[in-house]
């Protein structure tokens, strides 16, 4: 709770069973069997929340630092407790759900407490693929009724093929012209089934086409593309180059990086240092992001290096501790390689990736500065080492 995450629990695994869910595999990290949150538990949680000073930051329902995205609005008391939170505190709250909030209730709360609810609605898709991906999710009608009101701050949905993301964007914008449209592709990881993986990859092939259609539609909503690490890296290439230049690395220095940053550096700073490309082996699939690298991933790529520079973002997998997303500690990792000295690039951190790198994540930037820039073809042509 020190990170303002409200620890509710369904007391069981999420029953929604979305085929794309990143919670299908827990082997890479420690999990906790937390019982169903009771009224007594909630009273304790609420008192703890009330004891914290109110700041600009929001409290969160619907996820934790271990990437658990169980839909907590399936808890039978979730809406009652949300109301009590809003009534008895002056704090703001962020909600994550695929649409299990009663439409009238959540929109009435947004009217009653303007500016205090940041509702991030996971639409995923409104089209023909919805039943395959989300067999137990709320109906399209339920999702649209939630959207038809002031509650939803942002709606995320994805390209799954021709006339998917673009059609959804127009549908949502017709009934809600204010919510942010958060788009892109779903990323297949190694434990996602083959049929869903193929659908995700089909979506990526059509992302450019779908994005251009939305760009040409000139919707009143803010539109963003935020799931594609390669695109994000390319759009922020100047910031990435500037950050690495400021680290004052020598040409002989070995620097760990995921594929997206590796491609930027090889395109624009080929001989700045020795770039050690590290695949996201732990998560596998098409994952290609420094934030999701683990120490195990790095260890697999080390040979006889004596000094290696690590981006700090790898060490920020757990709040306030030097651990990766799997829970492995930096100290433990270092002990496995006694002949190698590890240095941390403190400027390459989660603050950079979560804030600065998202500044150019608008769909307009993708269409104009990525698709419209001939340099992106050279970027895409760069091959990653085996």
Predicted stretch roles:
Residues 102-106, 263-266:
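Short, well-ordered alpha-helical microsegments
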Residues 222-386:
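Radical SAM enzyme core and accessory elements
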Residues 2-10:
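Immediate flanking context of iron-sulfur cluster ligation sites
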Residues 5, 25-45, 49-103, 114-143, ...:
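Core AdoMet radical
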Residues 86-93, 115, 147-154, 173-181, ...:
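Structural alpha-beta junctions
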Residues 57-59, 117-118, 138-224:
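Conserved C-terminal portion of the radical SAM core fold
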Residues 9-26, 284-289, 311-317:
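Local cysteine-cluster metal-coordination motifs and their immediate loop/turn environment
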Residues 37-47, 74-83, 136-146, 164-172, ...:
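Well-ordered, non-membrane alpha-helical segments in soluble/globular domains
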